[in-house]
Amino acid sequence: MAKVIGIDLGTTNSCVSVYERGESKVIPNKEGKNTTPSVVAFTDKGEVLVGDVAKRQAVTNPEKTIYSIKRIMGLMSNEKNAQEAKARLPYHVVDRNGACAVEIAGKVYTPQEISAKILMKLKEDAEAYLGEKVVDAVITVPAYFNDSQRKATKEAGTIAGLNVLRIINEPTAAALAYGLDKKEAEKILVYDLGGGTFDVTVLETGDSVVEVLATGGNAFLGGDDFDNLIIDWLVNEFKNETGIDLKKDVMASQRLKEAAENAKKELSSAQETEINLPFITADATGPKHLVKKLTRAKFEGMIESLVAETITKINEVVKEAGLSKSDVKEVVMVGGSTRVPLVQEEVKKAFGKELNKSVNPDEVVAIGAAIQGAVIKGDVKDVLLLDVTPLSLGIETLGGVMTKIIEKGTTIPVKKNQTFSTAEDNQSAVTIHVLQGEREFARDNKSLGQFNLEGIPSAPRGVPQIEVEFDIDANGILTVSAKDKATGKAQNITISGSSGLSEDEINNMVKDAELHKEDDKKRKEAVEARNSADALVHQTEKSMNELGEKVPAEDRSNIEAALNDLKETLKDENASKEQIDAKVQALSAASHKLAEAMYKKDDNASGEQSGGKKKDDDVIDAEVE
């Protein structure tokens, strides 16, 4: 029987897996790696490069190297996220029939076509590994992908020569890989933070059933955004020092992206990293070099609001599932960006328990997709996967209101209908405007498409009966139909251990480490002191802004002086631990007044709260006429 491959088509990296001999395993690519960069490049000779080879030449070919294509998949050109992507990406994002596309050397490609090239490579790698032709596939998408994005993903698979058996949600695939062998029912939360998207899903697993209880997320939040914050910081620092704006230089921008991504990765294990980009640009005075040190504390200060956004979403989804955090037995971390220490710390803090990191965050989604493929083919028996629609679906009705037909969180596949009528006398046609979202008015939701039902017999308003049916298949893709009950006329639309070192090299490294142990210790202490100092600077500035006028002028002046002293010391790359510690101590002493102001603020707030009259939680204030 032909094999089914499971594909995690990621923003940054992609992965392919297969289920054979009773287990799902990752298929290495031809380069021997388990993941393939989601990068496509076009050369001057007309070659198309995919994966590592495309990524390696990105700096010298920025305008013809396409990455993060998933961020504009299924996106309309007038959407806010499309405008942001266009401003960020070095290649040309253009409009094609109202939707986002990319232009390379005068030719326009849709995101589906670019994604298909990635899928083709994964397909070819799988065929080389398995020694047979592969056609059938299960492809994953972020749980919070809307209908347009899901349909575009399926189209990419078709262009790549794949028969897409199913589109499933990434957190659901991860849960399938994690929970398939669980005998007792348990509720788990999958926190999935990838390169370009964020999902959080609460599921119940056990006894071969994986049921989604609630899901939420942000299809435009991920590791790319962490990188962009580092890039912005580097650009601003360089501009302040030289007056040159690196964002206007596409080759420099590509080098910055690469450096930012590497810095982010290094800060997952190190307290400090150096970003060194020689000959980044040049002016009349000669070549310019960019050399900056970035501490983990500084980086965490940059990304804390984005991480906080994910924690807010966790709380919403747990509540939507009708659970408390204590009901969640395991928190499973998925996606490469969950390696960032601050992400782990904040999620752990939110639940007050250790995180489950037993799964490989880069591979588990593809592994789950392959399991789902085996379920569809019948190779895995008695497994039931119950997924849900992430957003409500409905149509526009009189007054521009969105009338929901399928509510968010409904288990799929599902089919629901509702009967509507005409708004005017003798109306012979109605326009069915299909929407997705949670807002009350049509204009605030995502428009999925519209179609007309014509030939309605003349009748007073409110008399004709038009049945609108929404049908979501197991892929989460929607078909809408409308039928005039009197005539039977109908219309529909598919919205569619090897370190690589020898023993001698290892022994030499051990001896070298012993010789430089004291120097290394001092350097490490200085880095840790710098890291703590960065954190103190950030926290002090944040507290000053929050307290504002509550800090007396004299105290504010003393704190600002100590703050500036510490900042000046930190500018000195060779500052010792003792020098930094002295300035930290001075700032800490000056900052005691901030703590007093903070406690005073908290006391006042609690006093006001206790002084007010307590209202019952279940009582809703209302006026009755």
UniProtKB/Swiss-Prot annotation:
Keyword list, A-Z: ATP-binding, Chaperone, Nucleotide-binding, Phosphoprotein, Stress response
On whether Chaperone is a keyword of this UniProt record, the answer is yes
Entry-linked Gene3D superfamilies: 1.20.1270.10, 3.30.420.40, Actin, Chain A, domain 4, Substrate Binding Domain Of DNAk, Chain A, domain 1
> Known CDD domains for this protein?
ASKHA_NBD_HSP70_DnaK-like
Its domain of life reads: Bacteria
Q: Where is this region: Disordered?
A: 598-625
The keyword Zinc appears for this protein: no
Quote one Gene Ontology molecular function term: ATP-dependent protein folding chaperone
Residues that the record marks as modified (Phosphothreonine) are 197
What induces or represses this gene? By stress conditions e.g. heat shock.
Pfam families noted in UniProt: HSP70
- UniProt-listed PANTHER family: HEAT SHOCK PROTEIN 70KDA (PTHR19375)
User: What's this chain's function?
Assistant: Acts as a chaperone.
Q: Which family does it belong to?
A: Belongs to the heat shock protein 70 family.
Q: What is this protein called?
A: Chaperone protein DnaK
